[in-house]
Amino acid sequence: MSQFTHINASGEANMVDVSAKAETVREARAEAFVQMSAETLELIVSGSHHKGDVFATARIAGIQAAKKTWDLIPLCHPLLLTKVEVQLEAIESENKVRIESVCKLAGKTGVEMEALTAASVAALTIYDMCKAVQKDIVIENVRLLEKTGGKSGHFKVES
């Protein structure tokens, strides 16, 4: 079994030293779902939500969040991201929104946390913008879908 990388021999949490690692191109994809009523989803899809374009706001929030991951998650490194993409898709047959984020860089540490943060904050932004019309919205199934690069290599969720 793999060991925790952020815990030292004394059991204390520390930021991992990546100074000796080689720079490689690294990319990660994550997703999140936001479950809501058909009426709330229709407000978003039709563009008639009183707060404006929910998807555009959530997309920008996700991008901003990816860039601030190091400031939100205590042991994450500040990274020079070269790409952050957040896509939102209404799945009207299931009354939900699917969010997929992609983060990329050439660096010494991975971007999984940045991709997960982007998807999570985009989902939280949808909740924030819609809570006035529906309070029981559910954010669910936030997960890493795929990552490439680095020592641990390629990981992809089994469908």
Swiss-Prot record:
Source superkingdom: Bacteria
Family matches, as SUPFAM superfamilies: Molybdenum cofactor biosynthesis protein C, MoaC
- Which reaction(s) does its UniProt entry say it catalyses? (8S)-3',8-cyclo-7,8-dihydroguanosine 5'-triphosphate = cyclic pyranopterin phosphate + diphosphate
Q: Which GO terms fall under biological process for this protein?
A: Mo-molybdopterin cofactor biosynthetic process
EC number annotated for this UniProt entry: 4.6.1.17
Q: Which residues does the annotation say bind substrate? A: 75-77, 113-114
GO terms for molecular function, please?
cyclic pyranopterin monophosphate synthase activity; GTP 3',8'-cyclase activity
Which of UniProt's keywords are assigned here?
A: Lyase, Molybdenum cofactor biosynthesis
Q: Which family does it belong to?
A: Belongs to the MoaC family.
Q: What is the name attached to this protein's record?
A: Cyclic pyranopterin monophosphate synthase
